[in-house]
């Protein structure tokens, strides 16, 4: 056993003495040691109950002949961190989470790992850390919350509240309606109820085979979710010493491809691109951002979920057959785009896992021949504005897929919010928010507040927004993010001026500023990088080491 390094032989008597102080007995030193990586924190609605979930898992591990050791990672709630300097810390928290998993697991030489994530950066951070450790691993998330319901009976989610801010600013809703939306949108614990980043990543864990069926869709705080926890705990005990189930044997090139197929079919958050690039790097798997358009071109968008479709939420997807039903439909209708021989954590191939899966409600999960779109719900655009690529969630577009307009430039998200409220962004404009990339922020803030303001003010179908920052999974509209190279590293987005004409063609995968090469060269000569004070030592360290979004915004020591 890997854990023999801390428990076997007379030289390890001091180690055992400390373990005995934790309650271990003689017989425990012959059992596998299982790390239980929790992410319990009171301030995140998807995490405040995870201490109870960890108890369920630990009890089941003990019943099945292993010894659990619970430890915790940090967590940041993107919704609460939104709209102020707290958002600078969201993406960097992913690296802290990854480092903490690696540190605890390797410092104590635990044999296997079960991770309990749920929201935002916690799932990708845990995946990255687990891949570095490379022991048998299972992910079981806390689960999505139920959708909210207003007094009028309308189903809503957190994104509805952000958009209500814009509607209230524009005097389109009353104070009473505004309050009702605020108080109704998040009715229970769990990750936010739509296909936002948290649910996207928990769904992709299922698609990659590192989580059991239902991981992405079974509601939080339900008896069904508790049984999933027990099943995951039993399974980690069964495979704790089986090298076939080391996480790098599960998250392979095939698994990563399957994740991106499901991402396209379900219109996942644009953040998944950033995270899957980082996860692939830790797995030693090649994933080039340029490959994603090929996958998108081969995969129909068959499940549309809030915020893209405000009548459908994660619990609806579960009732309609879940992620397995989506994958089964894609595999039966779209050739060999899915890698059906990929190994899952149960020991089954993906094909075996899907053999009984079927769509139970075609109004929720559509057949391929009745898809929302013949291509996937994400696209990568290239052009002189994004030579290394940028990302758009095509599933969230509500207006035209081709757009031409004059730039209105802002050098920060805060500046943009003030400008939008003052009416500086008008119908037909391209709102440009720059110096918000991984280095420029630093931290690559989410632009949910600006996009939601535009939606709430009735401009969502008539304005495009481009940024070197990123978007919440709750964003909709013609919103282009992750522009690389970013402004802080000399990207063209930093050279734009108010009035410059910008063209976006989603179906042609292009984004272009209509400037001559001579004009661009002249602007580069005149360009002076704005200086931004970064008082935080951690953020300065992050700024120095982080790559741009086209590489996953990873810390790069090379």
Swiss-Prot record:
The protein's Enzyme Commission number: 4.2.1.9
Pfam families reported for this sequence: ILV_EDD_C, ILVD_EDD_N
Modified residues (N6-carboxylysine): 121
Residue positions of the active site: 472 (proton acceptor)
GO biological process: isoleucine biosynthetic process; L-valine biosynthetic process
GO cellular component: cytosol
Keywords: 2Fe-2S, Amino-acid biosynthesis, Branched-chain amino acid biosynthesis, Iron, Iron-sulfur, Lyase, Magnesium, Metal-binding
Gene3D superfamilies: IlvD/EDD C-terminal domain-like (3.50.30.80)
Biological pathway: Amino-acid biosynthesis; L-isoleucine biosynthesis; L-isoleucine from 2-oxobutanoate: step 3/4; Amino-acid biosynthesis; L-valine biosynthesis; L-valine from pyruvate: step 3/4
Annotated positions binding [2Fe-2S] cluster: 119, 192
Reaction(s) catalysed by this chain's protein: (2R)-2,3-dihydroxy-3-methylbutanoate = 3-methyl-2-oxobutanoate + H2O; (2R,3R)-2,3-dihydroxy-3-methylpentanoate = (S)-3-methyl-2-oxopentanoate + H2O
Cofactor: [2Fe-2S] cluster; Mg(2+)
Binding site for Mg(2+): 78, 120-121, 446
A molecular-function term among this protein's GO annotations: 2 iron, 2 sulfur cluster binding
Note on how the cofactor is bound: Binds 1 [2Fe-2S] cluster per subunit. This cluster acts as a Lewis acid cofactor.
Known partners and oligomeric status: Homodimer.
PANTHER family hit by this protein: D-XYLONATE DEHYDRATASE, D-XYLONATE DEHYDRATASE YAGF-RELATED
Protein family per UniProt: Belongs to the IlvD/Edd family.
Function: Functions in the biosynthesis of branched-chain amino acids. Catalyzes the dehydration of (2R,3R)-2,3-dihydroxy-3-methylpentanoate (2,3-dihydroxy-3-methylvalerate) into 2-oxo-3-methylpentanoate (2-oxo-3-methylvalerate) and of (2R)-2,3-dihydroxy-3-methylbutanoate (2,3-dihydroxyisovalerate) into 2-oxo-3-methylbutanoate (2-oxoisovalerate), the penultimate precursor to L-isoleucine and L-valine, respectively.
Name recorded for this polypeptide: Dihydroxy-acid dehydratase
Taxonomic lineage: Bacteria, Pseudomonadati, Campylobacterota, Epsilonproteobacteria, Campylobacterales
Gene name of this polypeptide: ilvD
